[in-house]
Amino acid sequence: MSSNQQPVVVGKIGSTYGVKGWMKITAYTDSVEGIFDYSPWFLKEHGEWREVKVSQWRFHGKAVVAELEGVSNREQAQMLTNCEIGILAEQMPELPEDEFYWRDLIGCEVLNTKGYNLGKVDQILETGSNDVLMVKANAKDAFGKTERMIPYLPDQFVLEVKLSEKQIIVDWDPDF
């Protein structure tokens, strides 16, 4: 992995499972087992990414557990608890032209229908009912806002996504 590539986070290491170095895995993929479609993984430890390989995995109830190469006991596994699991962006499936990954929206300018710049997408929250764009307002926001939370509801609030221009057009009152 080159130094300018940042892995795409697809999960997180959970607590240990047993005494032989197995770990519970929290997957952010569509299906919990989908995280194992990607290899290698990169783990973020102490702010640094390092490559790891999954030796084996299995279902544990509705969840999954995994064993990583080089991790053979509970103590080693505990050191990895809460580490993010990343993959290289090029490992992800290519999408049709009119679709995108949430990560593609990070950094996009958000403009309302009147052309007011509401700020840039800082992150996206998954709330269960609908996802929410967290928009960091510009430093000199005329309405004194520092952040806006805009529900990602196409046709209702999110009218257009222009990825080539890194812009999202929304129907949103800048004072809200």
Swiss-Prot record:
Signal peptide: none annotated. One of its GO terms (molecular function) is ribosome binding. Keywords: Chaperone, Cytoplasm, Ribosome biogenesis, rRNA processing. Disulfide bonds: none annotated. Pfam families: PRC, RimM. One of its GO terms (biological process) is rRNA processing. Gene3D superfamilies: PRC-barrel domain, RimM. Belongs to the RimM family. The PRC barrel domain binds ribosomal protein uS19. Binds ribosomal protein uS19. This is Ribosome maturation factor RimM. The lineage of its organism: Bacteria, Pseudomonadati, Pseudomonadota, Gammaproteobacteria, Alteromonadales.
